[in-house]
């Protein structure tokens, strides 16, 4: 009987503690538990990587200084437009399944050409592509854009296509359309499921170097970090621009960010690594910018902003010579280039138009950065001028846009860190409530209650005597007659068995009531279960089979011990 009472008290105490929001007060020990979580658990004074002679704090400072000018630069008429074939056939598998039918997946193309500046008009674009030198083949037309745009007198020299890390002819196809990037921002579209998982699985498993290969050279490790940082940067953008279905507004989603990025310090680190790689590529072409300074087609203000951005970068931000220092060979370099070119082609298999657009832009930007860093021979000035001179306008736009995406990712990481801190220290801190009302604290308080109950059961008579004695001391000034103690008759064993019988009867009745209520609730439970199955089947039918599972239903209950 006493044990049953104690167990009942335990259950009641546990339920009360679990459902109360203010059961406990946060202690220093709880605060230490918060500090041990994995959000950006990186020493900001450490270097980003062995090939980067710059710390996380230094990159944050650089990004803060250039952020305004970079944002204005990317919104200018020259850099905010991009040309792309959105419906190029996937060359890896049949990608007709899993189409994203959400309006957020679509892309708004430019139809009113009259609103475009002169250098984006069709006849101007056509002249750039057609007025080429006779000795060059058609595939080199677009590569000579910057030379023609700036009316340089230097004759271009033919160069093999083997230096490209992406297919530069993707932007001149007959099905290519012009897109205003400011009207199609990168944000959460709801695209996901098995098809999206297949994209990243193919990139990591079939194109990244294997675990046995990585660690043997910085080049192979750098390839994986580029892909991982690219993936993490996309996740950060989607977390920042997430549709709140209750308010209808696009706003940051801390829970989604934590589930995808915040709990994984290596992913945050790889984003900073990518930032350093692209920044060094921009710094490396700075001496050649006057040679294709857009010939007065871009106003002076935009030129100044571009100079302000690149001038604050430094050569120490990334040492590309160290990446291939010990194993620079044509075979490894060709393999590196071939694998990354495959990554850019895999973007054609993405069935969300908006996702494909930004995937192609950013992979093209990374490909351009790699070409600048690894194909320009510092000892050969002629080769440097030649490679930079053959950059297409789309490569240059993609390079700046990719740097802008990484800049926004770095800014978003710091923003999410502040949001995370406010949640930990806020009055409505559900994560704090988890640590304060966790199962072990509940058991601790329940154990106290059990001990108290058992002590009361075992010392009822002693408790009464102590109470009477304490009362006599409290009212010592009153002369009260002593109460006459009349012994009550005790039936002994009879009362004991009677109480036990009544208790067991009540338990049986309660069990029958539980079974009865379960049968009453059965139709409703079957209806809800069937509705959920139909809902999942419908999502699978329209191509978003795992859409529900990607949302964090219990966002605060992440596994903070994940490495």
Swiss-Prot record:
Keywords: Disulfide bond, Electron transport, Endoplasmic reticulum, FAD, Flavoprotein, Glycoprotein, Membrane, Oxidoreductase, Redox-active center, Signal, Transport. Disulfide bonds join 90-349, 100-105, 143-166, 150-295, 352-355. Induction: By unfolded protein response (UPR). It is an enzyme of class 1 (oxidoreductase). GO terms for molecular function: FAD binding; protein-disulfide reductase activity; thiol oxidase activity. Residues 1-18 form the signal peptide. Its cofactor is FAD. The active site is at 352 (nucleophile), 355. The Cys-100/Cys-105 and Cys-352/Cys-355 disulfide bonds constitute the redox-active center. The Cys-100/Cys-105 disulfide bond may accept electron from PDI1 and funnel them to the active site disulfide Cys-352/Cys-355. N-glycosylated. Changing residue 295 to A: Loss of regulatory disulfide bond and strongly increased activity towards PDI. It is a peripheral membrane protein. It comes from the Eukaryota. Glycans are attached at residues 21, 35, 53, 130, 342, 425, 458, 468, 491. It is found in: Endoplasmic reticulum membrane. Belongs to the EROs family. May function both as a monomer and a homodimer. The C-terminal part (437-563) is required for the association with the endoplasmic reticulum lumen membrane. This is Endoplasmic oxidoreductin-1. It comes from Saccharomyces cerevisiae (strain ATCC 204508 / S288c). The lineage of its organism: Eukaryota, Fungi, Dikarya, Ascomycota, Saccharomycotina.
């Amino acid at each position: 009987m006493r044990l049953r009472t104690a167990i009942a008290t335990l259950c009641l105490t546990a339920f009360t503690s679990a459902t109360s929001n203010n059961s406990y007060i946060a202690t220093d020990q709880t605060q230490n538990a918060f500090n041990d979580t994995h959000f950006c658990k990186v020493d900001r004074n450490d270097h980003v990587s062995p090939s980067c002679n710059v710390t996380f704090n230094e990159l944050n400072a650089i990004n803060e200084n250039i952020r305004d000018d970079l944002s204005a630069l990317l919104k200018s008429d020259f850099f905010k437009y991009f040309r792309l074939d959105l419906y190029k056939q996937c060359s890896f598998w049949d990608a007709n399944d899993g189409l994203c039918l959400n309006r957020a997946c679509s892309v708004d193309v430019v139809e009113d050409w009259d609103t475009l500046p002169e250098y984006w008009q069709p006849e101007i674009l056509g002249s750039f592509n057609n007025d080429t030198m006779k000795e060059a083949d058609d595939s080199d037309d677009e590569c000579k854009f910057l030379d023609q745009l700036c009316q340089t007198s230097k004759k271009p020299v033919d160069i093999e296509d083997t230096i490209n890390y992406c297919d530069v002819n993707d932007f001149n196809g007959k099905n290519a359309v012009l897109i205003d990037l400011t009207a199609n921002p990168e944000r959460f579209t709801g695209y996901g499921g098995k098809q999206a998982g297949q994209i990243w699985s193919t990139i990591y498993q079939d194109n990244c170097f294997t675990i046995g290969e990585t660690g043997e050279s910085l080049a192979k490790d750098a390839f994986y970090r580029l892909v991982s940082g690219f993936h993490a940067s996309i996740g950060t953008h989607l977390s920042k621009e997430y549709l709140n279905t209750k308010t209808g507004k696009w706003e940051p989603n801390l829970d989604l960010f934590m589930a995808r990025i915040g709990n994984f310090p290596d992913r945050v680190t790889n984003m900073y690594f990518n930032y350093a790689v692209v920044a060094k590529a921009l710094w490396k072409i700075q001496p050649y910018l006057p040679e294709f300074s857009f010939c007065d087609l871009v106003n002076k203000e935009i030129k100044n902003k571009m100079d302000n951005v690149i001038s604050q970068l430094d050569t120490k931000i990334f040492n590309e010579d160290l990446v291939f220092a010990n194993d620079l060979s044509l075979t490894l370099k060709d393999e590196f280039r071939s694998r990354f070119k495959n990554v850019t082609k895999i973007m054609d298999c993405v069935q969300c138009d908006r996702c494909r657009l930004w995937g192609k832009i950013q992979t093209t930007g990374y490909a351009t950065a790699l070409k600048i860093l690894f194909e320009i021979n510092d000892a050969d000035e002629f080769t440097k001028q030649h490679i930079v001179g053959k950059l297409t306008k789309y490569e240059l736009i993609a390079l700046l846009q990719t740097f802008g995406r990484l800049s926004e990712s770095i800014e978003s990481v710091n923003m999410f860190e502040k949001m995370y801190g406010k949640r930990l220290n806020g009055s409505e801190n559900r994560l704090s409530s988890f640590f304060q009302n966790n199962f072990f604290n509940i058991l601790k308080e329940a154990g106290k209650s059990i001990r108290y109950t058992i002590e009361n059961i075992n010392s009822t008579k002693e408790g009464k005597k102590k109470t009477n004695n304490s009362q006599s001391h409290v009212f010592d000034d009153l002369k009260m007659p002593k109460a006459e103690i009349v012994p009550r008759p005790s039936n002994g064993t009879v009362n004991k068995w009677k109480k036990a019988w009544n208790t067991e009867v009540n338990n049986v009745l309660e069990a029958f009531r539980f079974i009865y209520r379960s049968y009453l609730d059965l139709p409703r439970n079957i209806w809800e279960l069937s509705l959920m199955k139909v809902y999942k089947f419908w999502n699978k039918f329209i191509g978003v089979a795992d859409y529900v599972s990607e949302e964090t239903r219990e966002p605060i209950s992440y596994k903070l011990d994940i490495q």
